[in-house]
Amino acid sequence: MKTILFTSSLRIGIAMLSLLTASLLSHAAPAVSKPNVIFILADDMGFSDAGCYGGEIATPNLDSLARGGLRFTQFYNTTRCWPTRGALLSGYYAQQIHRDTLPDVPGGMRGVRQPWARLLPDFLKPAGFRCYHSGKWHIDGKVLDGGFDRSLNMNNQGNYFSAAGNAIDDKPVKPATNESGYYATIAIADHAIDCLKDHAANHAGQPFFHYVAFIAPHFPLHALPQDIAKYRDKYLAGWEAMREVRFGRQKEMGIVNTTLSALERNVGPPYAFPDAIKQLGPGEVNRPLPWGELTEEQRRFQATKMAIHAAMVDRMDQEIGRIIAQLKAMKAYENTIIFFASDNGASAEMMIRDGGHDPQAPPGSAKSYLCLGPGFSSACNTPFRRHKTWVHEGGISTPLVVHWPAGISAKGELRHTPSHVIDFVPTVLELVGVQKPKEWKGEPIPEAPGRSLVPAFAKDVTIPHESLWWYHEGNRALRVGDWKLVAAKGDPWELYNLRTDRAEQNSLATKMPEKVTELERTWQEQTDRYIQLARGTPGGPTATDGQGRKR
């Protein structure tokens, strides 16, 4: 009997001790329980540029994130810089919030968002988040008015070697008298790391959202000499060879299930600047001509441009590595969700602006102004057709890497669900347990089209979208399930089954006119709704945001 009583008492004592220990541990645990969020956005980076998406460019840090997390194979952007950024941070198509054009609606390309069109920080800050921005902005209004606590706004996107024109916390930067050693990609990472260090020192009890928007590898092709040297002769085999090699890697990885698109020899830049072509000299070509037909001077010039593009991506990855190192140093890495994507596909644009181009300057230096052009842009967008500004797959397809050690158990897996930058806001809100309000200062908030991707973090499921919709500068598209309707400006509709033909090589439009009619009706219905919204809310067709020229 004594043994039984002793045993019972011991069990009760152990249970009480366990409860006491649990209570003590809960009080001793760090205050931060919600995950931190970092979204890293590249600019004009092709679908296949990163090593983890088939590229030969050295991207060990992105590759490491991919090995430890997820790669999405059918993630989309809006095909252009500013519409993608507005959609990414709001959860709406850019046209719904006055941030891109609509058919037959004058102006409005870069209008002012409606009062209810809040950015993600406005929903996170009431939940205790600190919010930081480092890099390109390209959204209407001032950054701090968008809910961010700190910001480096890279307004100077025409010279990677100068801080002139940039702003910190919405106040103009005074550049150093001697800017030797300055490089924009490094400066963005420096600011991001400074924000993280300050957060660890002064706000460790709060979670954070950090939007890191690199301007690389957007033109002008400016890179550090030591980075260019890694790739100087790497691309002399030409764009056809580069596409074949990248496509082979993509198939081995299981990233694509399609053919390789044919090079469109007669498709050049989306805008014509003939004087710029002349100024760039005899090495420049504005079509993806057969590599073997180019002169030696042209081959060398084109390969050099691609080497600079690669150097810019390489350097961006190095700086991402420094940001990751800071997360680890402050013991935030495990519970930080890192997203990486690009704002549009690689660019076929060719122009000279800002400080102009000195043909005698070393390529990639501050006095040069070079653009990648359609040849190697086609290779960077392997295996897809077209480029930035078009809504064929090459213009709108982006890598999406998602990494979160504390929350995603899958390692190195692929996710094939069609998804879009409009899905980022609802994804984050679900991850951090924040309910989006139904109204803002008494004004109803319209339902947003984005859907949370959280179910796909656990397994490869399809996230249901009624459709995915595009319109930019007359280029238009709609995806419903595996069907895609697409047309370049002034061209008839093309119809593709993306399950087997994401390369968009075999249009079924003439064989399936009823499917074209069905999808066109859906595209038009959505477009009409967005036109009605744009015309019926302030800040649209006649408003401007003061952000300057097209990017």
Regions found by a protein language model. Give the residues of each.
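Bacterial N-terminal signal peptides
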Residues: 9-23
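Formylglycine-dependent sulfatase
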Residues: 24-489, 493, 500-521, 525-551
